[in-house]
Amino acid sequence: MKPLTPRQQQVFDLIKSKIEDCGMPPTRAEIARELGFRSANAAEEHLKALARKEAIEIIPGASRGIRILLEDAANEEQGLPLIGQVAAGEPILAQEHVEMHYQVDPGMFKPQADFLLRVNGESMKDIGIMDGDLLAVHKTQDVRDGQVVVARVDDDVTVKRLERKGSTVLLHAENEEFSPIHVDLESQHLSIEGLAVGIIRNTDWM
């Protein structure tokens, strides 16, 4: 990575701390507010400079589409974190949730996987996501209806197919024995933790 100016280092450090604390990068508006920029456009210019210096990657079309390339390089050496039991109110990628790391190339999944989540139950078995599988997940909140997502409803984390209907979200199982989960956004909290991008079934070789 090329040397950063003091201001660029501030932006870089803010992005890194937000990912560590919240599990996701900040928006342009959040960067501008925290660092005293006049507008989100000013933050965008600093992000472009960081991208030119290969410190970060900007993912088009996503409000939080920022990936730290140095972190990616470290993660590729360490492997993908396997997330176990997620504590209520804690970011899914908080260190205490990581059971271990698997030596898997994140780039084998498209988009690139950021973590693995062990599947519990058979609610998604009809599309080949089985109990005990390791689900590869791309960390993002930018998802479309019909995609399989990792969602947190209040304090419960689940893997389901997403459907939005006004102020209601339906999380569909892929098993006729399971009814959809109805989430009333006016009274319940829903957050999207990521997009399912693949599975690993036979882990004996890892």
Swiss-Prot record:
List residue numbers at the site (Cleavage). 88-89
Gene3D superfamilies, per database record: Umud Fragment, subunit A, Winged helix-like DNA-binding domain superfamily/Winged helix DNA-binding domain
Record EC number = 3.4.21.88
The enzyme's first-digit EC class, named in words, is hydrolase
Task: Give the active-site positions.
Answer: 123, 160
Q: Which Pfam families match?
A: LexA_DNA_bind (PF01726), Peptidase_S24 (PF00717)
Reaction it catalyzes: Hydrolysis of Ala-|-Gly bond in repressor LexA
Keywords of the record:
Autocatalytic cleavage, DNA damage, DNA repair, DNA replication, DNA-binding, Hydrolase, Repressor, SOS response, Transcription, Transcription regulation
What biological processes does GO assign it?
DNA repair; DNA replication; negative regulation of DNA-templated transcription; proteolysis; SOS response
GO terms assigned for molecular function: DNA binding; serine-type endopeptidase activity
Q: State the CDD domains in the record.
A: S24_LexA-like
Q: Member of which family?
A: Belongs to the peptidase S24 family.
Give the matching PANTHER family.
LEXA REPRESSOR (PTHR33516), LEXA REPRESSOR-RELATED (PTHR33516:SF2)
Q: How does it assemble?
A: Homodimer.
What NCBIfam families does the record point to? lexA (TIGR00498)
User: What is the name listed in the Swiss-Prot or TrEMBL entry for this protein?
Assistant: LexA repressor
